[in-house]
Amino acid sequence: MAPALDGLPAAERDVDASGPVAELLAAVSPRTLSRIKLGLRAFELLPFPWRFSRLSLAAREDFLRRMEGSRLGVYHELLLMAKVFATLGYAVAPEVEQRIGFETSCRLADGSDPQPSGPLGNTKPAGEEEECDVVVVGSGAGGAVAAATLAEAGLDVIVLEAGRSFNREDYPDQPLDAIAALYRDGGLTIAEGRPPIPVPVARTVGGTTVVNSGTCFRAPAAVLADWRRRFGIEWAGELDPCFAEAEQFLRVTPLDPERMGRNGQLAMEGAAVLGASGGPISRNAGSCVQCSSCPFGCEIDAKRGMHVSYLPRAVAAGARLRTGVEARRVLIEAGQATGVRCIAGALDSRNGCRGTYTVRARQATIVAGGALGTPELLLRSGLGGRQAGRNLHIHPACWVGARYDEEVRGWNGVMQSYYVDEWEPQRLLLEATFTPLAFGGGWLQGTGREHQRAILDFGHIGSIGVHLSDESQGRIGLAGDGSLRASYKLTSEDADRLAFGIARAAEIHFAAGATEVYPNIARVGTLTPKRLAEFEATSFKPSELRLEAFHPMGTARIASESEGVCGPDGSVHGVKGLHVADASLFPTSVGVNPMMTVIAFAQRISGELVRQRDG
């Protein structure tokens, strides 16, 4: 998959590419691991009667080219899986980084103002059972804000987090180690469908705010108005004070164009040539040193995730954080939620308590495990009715890369830096997004030596992410072994919108001076300005798109009992004292990075609980 070429080492001979990947796979669930093994085994056996690993280099490249040109969607899925895993371990090898000129520094800049990293107190469960007024499941944007709001109002709060706590003193040094430690299922959660879509989410103290790009958008006014009109969320138009308070506390500011890096500047220049509306992205990372390492945890905690913002506030007000505890069932007595039963110590070797751990909540139980974890817990508990886990939206996204004659060195910049909202009526948001080679290398064009040439060219690559506010839907369910199962069906209409967005991203690249564009659609290959019209005239099947998604939402949505899981106050239909406070509540796709909307919802819902207590 990665032969020697022009100074790049051969993966099989010169680089230990399998070791780091094996460590990553050790972090995934048995079900995910079995599916990965099945896919890679199928790839190995496809050249029947031979095996891929026993073919000559020339035969391998010929076979890979035929797979890439095939009309069979399953071939493209297996090929992409093989490329991703081959690149994961290879891309982080020092020999590869040195050859492509990759170097970055995440040291604090002079005069910077990093967020203090604690304290978060003793996070070990105090015995097999504890009591509190309110138990909060999850420590991400929803759970952390709810915990801070409730604790500062004088309530006794316990926050449960399945993952570990990290900060700038102890983030893993290597990217794959960080992915294994910080993400659920080692970042390999997949929404099954055609195409299958990776949906990586965090499992760590602070949730996905630890590994996201720090992008801060308010929910569009039109979306909030729709939620008020169609789903009865009367307060949806009253969130401006919540947004403003969060922006002030998190020190959210628009990115200085001088600091966004060349990748963002090229997107800005291309959009300006086209007259497309957009602007620098607002972020909660004033001390950012532009190292583009956001998905591995900020090594200097310049990004004000929940672990260095709202959670310390909650703990300072008396909340107790418990890590390494996986919530398994909401406890119900006489129609009232009374707490949560957990497995303690299963995911955190530093946790002193192992076995069953129970939290009894006198007043309320808040579930904020994200749009995957929240329905998973509700389903295990037999709660939420027929709608639990349904209505999954994910903002399917496509990486659109381009080659520039000039050096871009996108890793020396902010991961997400510039947005283009010109095509919002088409439900599209474009964001200049650059990820390190370990994350993005598998999406580069070509196979074999062609893919190696793309890796050599990585310093000349610019990239734009095309995000769709999807009408397509999926579902979270439980597999036969009790593990989470995600599925998603991309409609033809949404596939057409994504293809339109890819063409617009290509236009921006060409307007900024790119010589060729890589659209990440099966059998399309490389685009030039002359081929763009032909591309736009082509209709693509959903299965031909290569997508990722980072914003799951809607799986416990606010709607009537027949169409949703929760009422407008976040309470689960039919259960007293049980609330949801995360992106699961969103009735439809929010259309922008959801962190700030989650914060506003959590603040509103937890604030209402305080108001009810105060009478």
Protein language model regions, located:
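Helical element adjacent to the flavin cofactor pocket in flavoenzyme catalytic cores
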Residues: S293-Q363
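A glycine-rich dinucleotide-binding beta-alpha-beta segment and adjacent secondary-structure elements
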Residues: E131, P280-I281, S287-P295, R328-R341, ...
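Rossmann-like flavin
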Residues: L57-R60, R65-G69, E77-L78, Y90, ...
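Extreme N-terminal leader/targeting segments of oxidoreductases
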Residues: L8-V15, E61, E68-D133, G193, ...
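FAD cofactor-binding and catalytic pocket of flavoenzymes
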Residues: N212, G385-H509, K541, A549-G554, ...
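N-terminal Rossmann-like FAD-binding beta1-loop-alpha1 element of flavoenzymes
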Residues: E131-V159
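N-terminal FAD cofactor-binding segment of flavoenzymes
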Residues: L155, A162-V211, R218-A222, G264-G270
